[in-house]
């Protein structure tokens, strides 16, 4: 298997650290690490405090979001997801997350010649489809880089990590949940929307 790294510039909805207007996208980063005999390590994360989809779910379900998630349209901090949707998200980790968002912009748009988030926003046709932001995808053959022992060496590291108290490997719970064939629960509002779509 190959190691995968990807990042994407998206429609602007995140204010850089210290700013009050959107300039960065949520600029997700994805990572995948192959493992022999185990599910691969896979994670993806927005570089904002929450993904916009999570904010939209909180708004739909009437829940507040954690403090520091975003600013309302007045530029003031808010835990009301409906206000944040009208305002901006904030980068995770303050200026450090803002620097990672900057890195994603430069790698996915500056390096590839594709659209930065602000360009994707300006060119978006608002059809609810994905914006035309830049994307960088990297695939690495670990055997070519580290030799045949890369897997055993990495598994030793992961075993030591897992043996620490209350530590989980990213993607472990999600993979276990995907194997679960039990019943699923859908909130009432979502069920009603699905029923309306079927009419």
Describe the role of every protein-language-model region.
Residues 111, 116-199:
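Catalytic-core signal marking the mid-to-C-terminal active-site face
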Residues 13-82:
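Phosphate/diphosphate-binding glycine-rich loops and adjacent basic-rich segments that engage nucleotide
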Residues 22-28, 46, 99-125, 130-133:
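N-terminal nucleophile
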Residues 47-50, 96, 142-144:
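Glycine-rich beta-alpha junction loops
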Residues 53, 60-116, 123:
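Secondary-shell segments that build the walls of catalytic and ion/ligand-binding clefts
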Residues 9-10:
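Short, ordered loop/turn segments at secondary-structure junctions
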């Amino acid at each position: 298997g190959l190691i995968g790294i990807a990042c994407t510039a998206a429609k602007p909805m995140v204010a850089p650290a210290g700013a009050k207007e959107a300039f960065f996208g949520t600029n997700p980063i994805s990572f995948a690490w192959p493992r022999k005999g185990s599910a691969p390590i896979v994670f993806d994360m927005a570089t904002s405090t929450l993904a916009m989809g999570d904010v939209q779910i909180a708004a739909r379900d009437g829940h507040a979001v954690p403090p520091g998630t975003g600013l309302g349209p007045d530029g003031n901090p808010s835990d009301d997801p409906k206000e944040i949707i009208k305002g901006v998200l904030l980068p995770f980790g303050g200026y450090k997350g803002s620097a990672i968002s900057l890195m994603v912009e430069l790698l996915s748009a500056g390096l590839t010649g594709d659209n930065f988030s602000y360009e994707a926003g300006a060119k978006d046709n608002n059809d609810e489809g994905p914006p035309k932001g830049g994307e960088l995808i990297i695939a690495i053959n670990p055997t070519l880089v580290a030799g045949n022992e890369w897997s055993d060496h990495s598994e030793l590291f992961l075993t030591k990590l897992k043996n620490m108290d209350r530590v989980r490997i990213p993607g472990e719970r999600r993979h276990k949940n995907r194997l679960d064939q039990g019943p699923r629960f859908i909130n009432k509002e979502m069920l009603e929307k699905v029923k309306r779509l079927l009419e």
